[in-house]
Design a protein with these regions (language model features):
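Short, small-residue-biased leader/transition segments that mark boundaries at the very start
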Residues: 2-9
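Active-site core of glycosidic bond-cleaving carbohydrate-active enzymes
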Residues: 9-12, 19-270, 295, 300-309
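C-terminal beta-sandwich/jelly-roll accessory domains of carbohydrate-active enzymes
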Residues: 276-317
Length: 317
């Protein structure tokens, strides 16, 4: 049956990621049918939980309360990727990935922030309203599937860097604070966004700070509630230097691993990761002996084993 979850739609991303990364041991057609049903039919329930509250408004006007709308856009993008990869359905893929662009309906050029609108006339709400357990600064970057467009929207890479830098003044935001929350899921992917603006050293710097300041080897050492194992998963991804950034897309953005050598025992052959250590950033990367052109690694290049060699440099203090 359709599975309810926190914010109701993250399971769609999990299913799409599972398929993209090679998982096939499930009923693909049934999964897709339920994914579509929850995304297209208002009032669909699962386990007494409405799958997408406010879906009628999202469908007819392209908006919903801001944090909910951003959750829906990521889910739509994941469904679109699943439609393309698993079902070979280009029409559905185009529909859902285009609908994922609803995040643009939240952008207010007068403030350069995302914010909610009133349903009746589309006028702007208070910029600090409708953010679930966080603030507009935390949620702003929750468009992982369309980062180039988001960056261009606010004026380009320099403007994006200034906004990112201002977010990372602290790492321990509570629900009402306007800086980074290492202990809250909407912020998990933000350190790697520096890779999209050609600042991998800053990616390394922020992740190093999070390791030192937010995670501790104590019984209460996580920075927040480990919802569904999310904090632990973040720590593992960051430690091996591979982060699954884009919903439904088989690939990883990179940071310096925390270990000099890592061996992953994949089904066909091992994947070795070398060049890591504490407090480093990535200057360049070789994938299976060939220099990589970006801070992104396609899963297809390493899924059958191989090697990743990180060329790293010590962070400047």
């Amino acid at each position: 049956s359709l599975v309810g979850s926190e914010m109701c739609i993250r399971d769609r991303i999990i299913i799409a990621n599972t398929y993209a990364l090679g998982g096939r041991d499930f009923d693909i057609q049934t999964a897709y049918d339920y994914m579509k049903k929850g995304a297209l039919i208002p009032g669909t329930y699962s386990q007494n939980v409405e799958v997408r509250p406010g879906l009628h408004t999202y469908i007819t006007k392209g908006i919903e309360n801001a944090s909910l709308c951003l959750e829906y856009t990521s889910a739509d993008y994941a469904i679109g990727q699943f439609a393309l990869q698993a079902m070979g359905n280009r029409d559905d893929a185009d529909f859902f990935m285009n609908r994922a662009k609803n995040w643009k309906n939240l952008y207010d050029p007068s403030t350069t922030w995302l914010r909610s609108r009133h349903n009746h006339d589309l006028s702007w709400k208070d910029p600090n309203h409708d953010w679930r357990e966080a603030t507009k600064e935390n949620y702003f970057w929750m468009v992982p599937f369309d980062l180039p467009a988001l960056i261009d929207t606010i004026g380009g890479k320099a403007a994006a860097k200034a906004r990112l830098d201002s977010l990372f003044v602290r790492l321990d935001a509570g629900y009402d604070d306007h800086f980074y929350a290492a202990g809250n899921e909407p912020d998990f992917q933000v350190p790697w966004i520096y890779n999209w603006i050609d600042c991998p050293e800053e990616t390394g710097r922020v992740i190093s700070r999070i390791f030192h300041e937010a995670y501790h080897a104590t019984p209460n050492g996580l920075p927040g509630n480990d919802d569904g194992g999310s904090m632990g998963a973040w720590y593992v991804f960051a430690s091996v230097g591979l982060y699954p950034m884009i919903p439904g897309v088989a690939g990883f953005t990179v940071n310096a691993p925390q270990f000099e050598r890592i061996t992953m025992h994949l089904p066909e052959a091992p994947l070795t990761i070398e060049g890591g250590g504490a407090d480093l950033w990535v200057r360049s990367l070789k994938v299976n002996g060939k220099k990589n052109k970006s801070m992104w690694v396609d899963w297809k290049d390493i899924c059958k084993g191989g090697s990743l060699l990180y060329e790293t440099k010590k962070l400047r203090r």
